Regions:
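Mature catalytic core of soluble alpha/beta enzymes
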Residues: 1-178
């Protein structure tokens, strides 16, 4: 239990809480003998083993860009990822949780340098061997310039990323899809 002396102080674990919970559930299920499953908890996807036919689990990366009518078609994917046993796919983006005021869209991922919604990209997908780490990285990388995020991801072992930019182009880390 954590207590704060200042009653106005709050701790929001939203950027890692779901990923951590998914990882703990997956590990508990594996410890109890589950050998094949794909957990999907609100966009945090975690592979347990392989599919029953021994093939890899495949997860889609949502399309973060609106169509001609301004609608977001998250049923369309811009890429798919083959997840190895124990791998997770976690995506952070500006296209699901937002509101619009005077034609300006405000989403929930805040850039700490501006205290405004981060505007470096539309979405970033992270593949890692820990869903909690993937969740933290997807939020953090979303809130930093692409070049800094690329440098960070390339320094990490067993972590890959796909960036979806506002000009509808994509950048990927050196090991994405391999």
């Amino acid at each position: 239990t954590v207590y704060f002396a200042d009653p106005e102080l709050q701790l929001d674990v939203g950027s890692i809480g779901k990923g951590y919970a998914v990882e703990q559930c997956a590990q508990a299920a594996e410890a109890r003998g589950l050998t094949s499953a794909l957990l999907n908890v609100g966009g945090n996807v975690r592979a347990i083993g392989t599919k029953p036919n021994s093939g890899p689990w495949v997860a889609g990366v949502d399309n973060p860009w609106p169509d001609q009518d301004g609608q977001y078609a998250t049923a369309r994917y811009v890429d798919t990822v083959e997840l190895q046993p124990g791998q997770s796919l976690v995506i952070s983006g500006d296209y699901q949780r937002y509101f619009t005021v005077d034609g300006v869209r405000y989403h929930h991922l805040i850039d700490l340098t501006t205290l405004q919604p981060a505007r470096y990209m539309n979405s970033v997908a992270i593949v890692s061997s820990d869903s909690g780490l993937g969740d933290a990285l997807s939020t953090g990388v979303f809130c930093m310039p692409v070049e800094k995020g690329q440098a960070l991801i390339e320094q990490l072992n067993d972590v890959e990323a796909l960036w979806m930019l506002s000009d509808e182009t994509m950048l990927q880390s050196s090991g994405w899809g391999k």
